[in-house]
Regions:
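N-terminal cationic and glycine-rich segments that engage phosphates or anionic surfaces
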Residues: 153, 196-200, 288-291, 321
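Short hinge/gating elements
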Residues: 52-57, 157-164, 200-203, 257-265, ...
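Conserved, well-folded catalytic cores of nucleic-acid-processing
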Residues: 12, 16, 42-46, 58, ...
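The Walker A/P-loop phosphate-binding site
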Residues: 2-108, 126, 133
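Conserved inter-motif catalytic segment of the P-loop NTP-binding fold
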Residues: 69, 74, 78-163, 167-172, ...
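Charged, alpha-helix-enriched surfaces in structured cytosolic catalytic cores
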Residues: 4, 34, 38, 50, ...
């Protein structure tokens, strides 16, 4: 392209011509924020700023909890203390959503919701547009896009004999905001429901919201199924296990793979349980029946030199060290890792192995 042509384009449209190397460098400099140990591994690191995330699943499957847990991480100083906006479309936000998420600062979340009269899809998405444009590095959780309703539908009587207009509105919203989100380094999380596939072909359930939303999303996660998480002894349900399918990831990751998330009631995503499961899978913690051995400590006894010294165990005595870090049941193992503040060390050991 000639210099004259470049000058003409720049004069007419502004500085829209950018060197490819600069674009590549800008993408590399985008921060990646962790979600949970299991999802981070499957996604290739977590969620990258400047991207769109779609979380799809059945009701009560853990989508909102996961989104709010991510918000809690984004509130931390090391991740920029980002502004959090929760778009409460479903109007079902409850105290348990706030109290049941470890580390979540409710006083630092701005909730957008209807007062007396319901808000239309156009109004909600218009508010999101203004918030993203005026708040760099923000995180917006739209919960859910499946519950949005067009102004036209709000103004008319309830009917079921025509196609609703929300997919078109969402399509226009995505087009309008596609270049704004990366420029503002924002993260938009679109919580989405599964709906019945009435086409009669293919999957029984499909994601609500239209095709354009899926085209726009940089990362798409589906909760394929869930199961009850119960205590082994008492049989009391303490949470649920989420089986995530990685449809696509902005960071590459394992597309088509599965990530198993552990949601503990009253806590949110149980990151320690996920670390334990990963460590067990990759033999940093071995198991034999109900017994668990911290092999990563057997191989690196200097990490627990203090406790070993207190128990008169020599750093070279591998047999005694193995007995010292062997526990009957997960609970005793967790207590040991808690008491000796070893979770970060375990996480770093996993990161080194998987990098």
């Amino acid at each position: 392209m000639s210099a004259a042509a470049l000058k003409t384009i720049t004069k007419k449209y502004g500085n829209i011509l950018v060197n490819g190397a600069q674009v590549f460098e800008d993408l590399k400099n985008m921060k990646v924020i962790p979600v949970s140990p299991s999802l981070d591994y499957a996604l290739g690191g977590g969620f990258r700023e400047g991207t769109w995330i779609q979380m799809i699943g059945d009701p009560k499957s853990g989508k909102t909890t996961t989104a709010l847990q991510f918000a809690a991480t984004c509130q931390k100083k090391e991740y920029g203390e980002r502004p959090i906006f929760y778009i409460n479309v479903e109007a079902r936000l409850s105290t348990k959503n706030f109290e049941g998420i470890e580390g979540l600062q409710a006083d630092k979340i701005t909730v957008v919701q209807a007062e007396e009269e319901p808000l239309s899809a156009e109004q909600y998405l218009g508010a999101v547009e203004k918030l993203v444009k005026s708040h760099p590095n923000c995180v917006v959780i739209i919960d859910s896009i499946s519950s949005l309703i067009a102004q036209k539908d709000l103004d008319e009587e309830v009917r079921g004999d025509y196609r609703p207009g929300v997919p078109k509105i969402l399509s226009n919203f995505c087009k309008k905001m596609s270049s704004v989100v990366p420029k503002q380094k924002a993260i938009i999380i679109m919580v989405t429901h599964f709906i019945a596939n009435t086409a009669g072909m293919g999957k029984k359930k499909v994601a609500d919201g239209g095709v354009k939303v899926r085209y726009q999303a940089d990362t798409i996660l589906e909760i394929a199924w869930t199961q009850a998480w119960k205590e082994k002894n008492e049989g009391r349900q303490i949470g649920q296990v989420m089986h995530w399918k990685i449809v696509t990831s902005a960071l590459g990751g394992f597309v088509g793979g599965e990530a198993i998330g552990w949601l503990r009631y009253g806590l949110g995503i149980d990151k320690k349980q996920e670390l334990f499961e990963q460590a067990n899978d990759f033999d940093l913690i071995s198991s034999a029946g109900a017994w668990y051995t911290c092999d990563f400590l057997v191989e690196n006894p200097e990490l627990i030199s203090g406790p070993l010294k207190e128990n008169n165990i020599d750093l070279e005595d591998k047999e005694k060290i193995t007995k010292f870090v062997k526990f009957q049941g997960q609970q005793k193992l967790r207590e040991f890792l808690d008491e000796n503040k070893l979770w970060d060390i375990l996480e770093n050991s996993l990161a080194e192995m998987l990098s």
